[in-house]
């Protein structure tokens, strides 16, 4: 009887070890396949009213309506009501470099706001304002002319005829949820239109609204 029990225990242990080895080998093989996949980087000029994801149960427009490339994901978000540059990649290291706060990667936005910010408002944005999730990092803020490369938005923004608008060039080194909009609202100038122009070295140059292109990724960039 003892010999029978011992044999059963040995078989169970052997079966468990074989099952563990198979699962471990499967995970290692999957990891190896991912590591051996070529790194891909896609730049996309996202139109207004497009979700920064590939699926949506509600049937709204998504990246799938524009980009046929599979296996890439957006580095950071760009709200449905914002426009401009999305960087999509399957490279986790690049995603981290573009989005993690500790990397301090610069992101440039062109922002149309209601009213004309005075020096006090501009200085507050430059040095940092305190939002409900804490103070913002110092940012680059300039009043600029409307960009000459800008495309018309569909539908156009809603302007109040008795209130002028102005354009800001905003450079951030962090990326919180709807941060630019919350910053400008904090100083009394709500955002009417927001276009992301660049993330690190990647820019909108040469991309029409709704257009995408895949670029070669430099090693150790």
Swiss-Prot record:
SUPFAM superfamilies according to UniProt: Pseudouridine synthase (SSF55120)
GO biological process, one term: rRNA processing
PROSITE patterns: PSI_RSU
Residue intervals passing through the bilayer: none
Enzyme superclass (EC): isomerase
Gene3D superfamilies: Alpha-L RNA-binding motif (3.30.70.1560), Pseudouridine synthase I, catalytic domain, N-terminal subdomain (3.30.70.580)
EC number of this enzyme: 5.4.99.20
Highest taxon above the source species: Bacteria
Keywords per UniProt: Isomerase, rRNA processing
Annotated catalytic residues: 79
Entry's Gene Ontology molecular function annotations: 23S rRNA pseudouridine(2457) synthase activity; RNA binding
Residue ranges of coiled coil: none
Reactions accelerated catalytically: uridine(2457) in 23S rRNA = pseudouridine(2457) in 23S rRNA
PANTHER family registered for this protein in UniProt: PSEUDOURIDINE SYNTHASE FAMILY PROTEIN-RELATED, RNA-BINDING S4 DOMAIN-CONTAINING PROTEIN
Role: Responsible for synthesis of pseudouridine from uracil-2457 in 23S ribosomal RNA.
NCBIfam families recorded: PRK11394.1, pseudouridine synthase
Family to which this protein belongs: Belongs to the pseudouridine synthase RsuA family.
Protein name, UniProt field: Ribosomal large subunit pseudouridine synthase E
